[in-house]
C-alpha cells in the first residue's frame, strides 16, 4: 500500500480505503432513502510531518498514557517520534497539512535510553511490572543492556517502543496496513541496521473494564469481546479492548499484562455515555519479538480485512 510523503504534491497517486463504483453509489443512495445515514470517508496514509504533526502527536501521547499522562514529557517524546529519518505513518482525510486521525511509529529505546523523557517511560514500565517477576526481569535485561560492553560473543538486544494511537471512532481495519508499512520502512531505512534492527518491541496500550453504574444496579453484564489478563490482582479480570489489534499482538507476545494507573483522574461513573456501565481504563503492556510481530501482521489482515 502506497502513502504520501511530505514532499509529494497533493495530486500524487495514493492508495485509499475505498473507491466507489456507480453500482455502489446506487446501493448507498437506496440505503440512504431507507433512513440510514451514510458518510463516505477516504483515509490517506502519510509519512510523519514534523511541520504539521507535532501538536497532534502530543495529544495522541496524552490519550495513550491515559490517567498517568502527566507523568511523561510528551513534548520531548513527540520530538523523538519526529526526528530526522524517522519511520511511521499518519492517517488523514484532508491532505498532508491536516491533523492526523491516527499514528503508528517506533522509538529506538536502546539508542535513546539516557534521554530523560524516555528514561521516565522505562522507570514507569519497570515499576508497573515489578510484581510480574519474569516480565520485569526480561525488561530489565533489555532496557539495561546499554551498560553492557558488546563483544564478539554477546551483543546488546535492541528494543523499539511502538507508539500506536488513533481517534476513538477510527476503525481497526486501518491498522494492519500501518503495521505492514512500518516494518517495510524499518527494513528499507538508510540507517536500518543501526537504528531500526530491533530484537523486541514494547507496546504501550490501553484496555478497560465495564463497571456497574453507581446510581443503579446492573441486572446483567453487557455482552462484548473480552479477554482474561494477568494483573497485580490474584484473580484475573475481564477486560475489553480500545485497540482490537492488541488481541493479535497478545496471542504472539512474549509477555503481556494490564495494570491500574497510578492516578485516577476521572470517576468511572462519569465516563458513562448512553450506557448503564461506566468505563474503568487500565494500562496494557505488551512485549513481542521481531519475528512474532512480523507474523502478527498477516493475522491482523485476516482478522480485520480492509473495507
Swiss-Prot record:
Acidic residues bias: start-end ranges: 21-36
Entry keyword annotation includes Nucleus: yes
GO biological process, one term: protein transport
Pfam families: BCCIP
Subcellular localization, as worded in the UniProt entry: Cytoplasm; Nucleus
Membrane-traversing stretches: none
Chain residue ranges for the region called Disordered: 1-36
Main location as per UniProt: cytoplasm
GO cellular component, as recorded: cytoplasm; nucleus
InterPro entries associated with the record: BCP1_family
Top-rank taxon: Eukaryota
Role according to the record: Involved in nuclear export, actin cytoskeleton organization and vesicular transport.
Protein name, as recorded: Protein BCP1
Organism of derivation: Debaryomyces hansenii (strain ATCC 36239 / CBS 767 / BCRC 21394 / JCM 1990 / NBRC 0083 / IGC 2968) (Yeast)
Gene for this chain: BCP1
